[in-house]
């Protein structure tokens, strides 16, 4: 399993980038929209990586911060949430705002996230209620402001 990746940003796509390592190998890495927007072509970067192994593909999901990586991993423990849905959530909202929504048990807020209907939101609240500790809102951001700042929410097929 690949746990981290260090190299230069070779190219940028809508929902992914190619990171070329010192050995000359380029890895396609899918990332949350807001974090992908922080990258520039040619820049050096180190990403926290989740490696998803499927029958038909090995897919890398990358994160600039441990906070995003940890929430991605937590979301994958929820029944019915796979890597694409977790990436969609992280493309739409910052981790602190997501945790705040779970703590306040506001199902209406969670259903605004891409791919999250009422049943999935209820499952998120049920399965995360005892696993999410207290979180202070980032500089007083409301959930709506944090969703807007998080990204477009668009996730292309991997």
Stretches with model-predicted labels:
Residues 70-71, 85, 105-109, 154-158:
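A general alpha-helix detector
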Residues 120:
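Conserved Walker
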Residues 58-63, 83-102, 123-132:
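Amphipathic, charged-and-aliphatic alpha-helical interface segments
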Residues 64-67, 100-103, 149-156:
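Short acidic alpha-helix initiation/capping motifs at coil-to-helix transition points
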Residues 1-77:
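Structure-specific DNA junction-binding interface
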Residues 111-114, 124:
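Glycine- and Gly-Pro-enriched alpha-helical subdomains that act as flexible
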Residues 127-158:
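Strongly charged, low-complexity linkers/loops
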């Amino acid at each position: 399993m690949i746990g981290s990746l260090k190299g230069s940003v070779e190219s940028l796509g809508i929902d992914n980038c190619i990171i070329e390592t010192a050995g000359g190998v380029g890895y396609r890495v899918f990332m949350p929209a807001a974090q992908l927007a922080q990258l520039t072509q040619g820049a050096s970067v180190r990403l926290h990586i989740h490696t998803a192994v499927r029958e038909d593909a090995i897919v890398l999901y990358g994160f600039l911060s441990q906070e995003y990586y940890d929430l991605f991993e937590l979301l994958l423990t929820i029944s019915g949430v796979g890597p694409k849905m977790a990436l969609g959530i992280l493309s739409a909202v910052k981790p602190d705002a997501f945790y705040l929504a779970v703590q306040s048990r506001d199902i209406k807020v969670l259903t605004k996230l891409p791919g999250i209907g009422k049943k999935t939101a209820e499952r998120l609240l049920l399965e995360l209620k005892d696993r999410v500790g207290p979180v202070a809102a980032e500089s007083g951001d409301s959930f709506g402001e944090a969703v807007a700042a998080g990204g477009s929410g668009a996730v292309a097929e991997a």
